[in-house]
Amino acid sequence: MFLTKHFVFVHIPKTGGNFVHRILQDHAPADWELKIFDVHATYAEIPESHRHLPRLAFARNPFSWHVSWFHFQQQERDAFYMAISDNGTLGFKDAMRRAYTGNGVLANSSGALTQTLFEMLGEGLEGAKVGKIESMREELLRMFGECTEVPTKMVEAIQQVPPQNTSTHAHYSTYYDPELRDLVRQKDAPVFDYFGYQWEDAPP
């Protein structure tokens, strides 16, 4: 989480937060009073001094988000990943089915991205300004600009700085079969519907 006197940026995992971190750390004016808070702190942890400020964040197509999260966890291997992947032995499709069906840990709840967004930004995202990572540069300029004047050097950096901490993998569509595609669409329906996300085939 990044605190300024103009806004609070909440870092949703796997939605470009490292890019935002670099932009703010390298280019935020001193009078923005930038403070780096706990990396993945939620809206409930925003200090009282900043709770009146706009909450900014990014969302991502859930189909893409699940694939990115899975690849990241193949290195991190946290307890949740180890549980759904049978200690790292299952591939993406089998691990996701294990999480979302039968006795899986998320079988009787909403999808992982829906839960993450609501936990970190508030149920229904009320009061939050949430951009789409698929057009991150334009969205970041828009969201910052709605809160304060954005310095020219920061505008240039947002337009030019390379993506940060990205994982290398094929287009998300190659990871799904029709059954898993429908399952994730159902589980994360609130995110798909709120942001207008849809399935996209890999570019030719």
Regions found by a protein language model. Give the residues of each.
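Membrane-interface amphipathic segments in extracytoplasmic regions
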Residues: 1-204
